[in-house]
């Protein structure tokens, strides 16, 4: 996803930006509901669409259903204010076509998921 957002910022068009804005708007709307996770992933899916790379898009679509199930089961996607802020900042950086800053922010945004995956790999 770090490379996907970099490419999205570099390659996105007006249609992609509108889709990202709509996904972000829905994420905000459903933030305090159980639907938050699906709208969170819709935002990430819109980033994959906007990068115009079919491999990134296909890979994300393959893993999303399983990741969503794990997130909901283990409740690792608890609402935090930094998630809202990070999504807003990512959208702004994409609109500015700043791929490097967007990629750095995505890496930070996904660090909790990386840490969770490492713990799961080390668990008996």
Where are these regions (language model features)?
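Conserved amphipathic alpha-helical segments that form helical-bundle/coiled-coil interaction surfaces
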Residues: 1-73, 82-89, 101-116
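Alpha-helical DNA-recognition elements
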Residues: 119
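…primarily DNA-binding HTH/wHTH and HhH modules…
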Residues: 122-124
């Amino acid at each position: 996803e770090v490379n996907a957002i970099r490419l999205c910022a570099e390659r996105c068009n007006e249609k992609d930006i509108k889709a990202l804005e709509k996904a972000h708007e829905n994420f905000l709307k459903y933030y305090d509901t159980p639907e938050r996770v699906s709208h969170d992933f819709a935002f990430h899916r819109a980033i994959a669409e906007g990068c115009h790379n079919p491999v990134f898009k296909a890979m994300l679509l393959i893993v999303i259903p399983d990741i969503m199930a794990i997130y909901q089961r283990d409740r690792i996607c608890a609402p935090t204010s930094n998630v809202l802020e990070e999504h807003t900042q990512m959208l702004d950086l994409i609109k500015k076509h700043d791929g490097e800053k967007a990629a750095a922010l995505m890496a930070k945004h996904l660090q909790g998921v990386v840490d969770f995956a490492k713990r799961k790999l080390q668990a008996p």
